[in-house]
A protein has these predicted regions:
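A surface-exposed partner-binding patch
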Residues: 1-113, 179-183
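A broad, low-specificity signal marking well-ordered, structured residues that form hydrophobic/aromatic
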Residues: 105-106, 118, 131, 142
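Structured loops at beta-to-helix junctions and adjacent beta-edge loops in soluble globular domains
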Residues: 109-111, 123, 133-135
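Short acidic/polar mixed-charge low-complexity motifs
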Residues: 114-116, 138
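Short, surface-exposed beta-strand/loop micro-motifs that present aromatic residues
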Residues: 116-123
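A short alpha->loop->secondary-structure connector
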Residues: 127
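Compact, glycine/acidic-enriched structural inserts
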Residues: 131-162
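Acidic, proline/glycine-rich low-complexity IDRs
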Residues: 150-183
Length: 183
């Protein structure tokens, strides 16, 4: 199973995505977060987690979790938001409400179990720190890490319990990047 940054699809660094985002949205991003956004593919398919073919659809057989055993935190991360998506939604989406903007929290990833979000702080006193806020009204911010790479280092690939197949029943054909289930 993969862990840390080996879970991400890499991209060629250009520096253009973050520069355009900062100009359009009017926010200054932390340097390490800029590198992260430029080095790795973001969006719905950002992770290299294992998938299987099911009726011509690729379904994940593993999930990506943020795990901090010391703090007893385990969050299933669905995906990281693409900068273009954030850029277009920042000023108009209720999901990115004034509450987050006034606290200088930029949503960067979606947590799928509690419908929460992972945020990066843009405020001076904790610039670049990573926080989690659950999807419920009274959920309080939870500190996760001091920067995006420390956060990414705690990501691990874990198996999804699926009654349709057992792991011993899967195989890959040469050149395929997904698993097939033996019939």
């Amino acid at each position: 199973m993969k862990k840390g940054i080996e879970l991400f699809k890499s991209e060629i660094y250009t520096g253009k995505k973050t520069t355009e985002f900062e100009k359009t949205v009017g926010l200054k991003l932390p340097v390490l977060f800029k590198y992260f956004c430029e080095m790795f593919e973001l969006g719905q398919e950002c992770f290299l987690n294992a998938k299987r073919s099911f009726d011509d659809i690729l379904l994940p057989i593993t999930s990506v979790n943020y795990v901090d055993l010391k703090e007893n935190i385990n969050l299933r991360i669905s995906h990281f938001y693409e900068l273009k998506e954030l850029q277009s939604r920042w000023k108009e989406d209720i999901e990115f409400s004034e509450w987050f903007k006034t606290r200088n929290l930029l949503p960067i990833a979606y947590e799928e179990i509690n419908l929460g979000q992972i945020f990066i702080s843009l405020s001076q006193n904790d610039f670049g720190n990573i926080w989690y806020i659950g999807g419920y009204e009274n959920d309080k911010p939870i500190y996760l890490s001091k920067n995006i790479f420390e956060f990414a280092s705690k990501l691990v690939e874990t198996e999804i319990n699926d009654e349709d197949f057992k792991n011993k029943q899967v195989y890959k054909n040469w050149g395929e990047d997904f698993w097939r289930v033996k019939e």
